[in-house]
Regions:
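Flexible, solvent-exposed loop/hinge segments and secondary-structure transition points
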Residues: 32-177
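Bacterial N-terminal signal peptides
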Residues: 3-5, 12-27
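Intrinsically disordered, low-complexity segments enriched in polar/charged small residues
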Residues: 8-12, 100-102
Length: 177
C-alpha cells in the first residue's frame, strides 16, 4: 500500500504535465512584436500646405515673396520653397520655425513667449534647430503632430508669417480629422 501511495504522488497528472509544458514554451518564445504605426504628412499634403500659403499671402503678382518649409513628424524637411526675393537665411529660418512648431506642438510665436526671459522653460531655446521667432505652426491630427510648416519673409513680419503658415494648414484641415 505504501508503494502505491508513493507512486501516485510521484507520477504527475496529465493536466499538470500539459500546464508545465505550455508555461515553459510560452516563457521561452519571444513576445510577439507589433509594428509601430505612425501618421505622417504626405508629399501631397505638404504640396497642398505650400499652395495654401502661396494662395493666402505668398505672391506679389507673379513673384513668390515668402519662403516656406514643411517638415514631417520627425522634424525632417518634407518640402521647401525659397521665395524669388528671399534672403539667403530665409530658407533656414522657415525650416527652423516649422521644426520648433512641430517639436513643441504649438505655434512658434507662442513657444517664443513661453520661453522668454527668466521662464523655467528658457533653457529650451538652447536646443538644436529651435528658434524663438513667429511663423511656425504645427500640423496636427487631434493631439498627434504629423508635421509643421514655417514661413519667413511675409510682409508684416512674424505675425504675418504665422498667419500665412496657418493658412497653409487650413488648406488641408479636411484631411486632419
Amino acid at each position: 500500500m505504501s508503494r502505491l501511495s508513493f507512486r501516485s504522488t510521484v507520477v504527475p497528472s496529465l493536466a499538470s504535465v500539459i500546464l508545465t509544458t505550455v508555461t515553459f514554451v510560452m516563457a521561452a518564445s519571444p513576445a510577439q512584436a507589433q509594428a509601430l504605426l505612425q501618421r505622417n504628412i504626405s508629399a501631397a499634403q505638404a504640396m497642398a500646405v505650400v499652395e495654401g500659403v502661396l494662395a493666402s499671402c505668398g505672391r506679389d503678382g507673379t513673384r513668390v515673396i515668402v519662403t516656406i518649409a514643411v517638415v514631417d513628424r520627425a522634424g525632417q524637411p518634407r518640402l521647401m520653397l525659397a521665395g524669388d526675393t528671399a534672403s539667403p537665411h530665409n530658407l533656414d529660418l522657415a525650416r527652423r520655425k516649422a521644426y520648433t512648431a512641430r517639436t513643441f506642438r504649438r505655434p512658434s510665436l507662442e513657444w517664443a513667449a513661453r520661453t522668454a526671459g527668466d521662464s523655467p522653460r528658457a533653457g529650451q531655446r538652447q536646443l538644436t534647430d529651435v528658434i524663438p521667432l513667429g511663423g511656425g505652426v504645427p500640423i496636427m491630427i487631434g493631439d498627434e503632430p504629423i508635421g509643421g510648416v514655417g514661413v519667413s519673409g511675409a510682409v508684416g513680419g512674424q505675425p504675418a508669417d504665422e498667419a500665412c503658415a496657418m493658412a497653409g494648414v487650413a488648406a488641408i484641415a479636411d484631411q486632419l480629422q
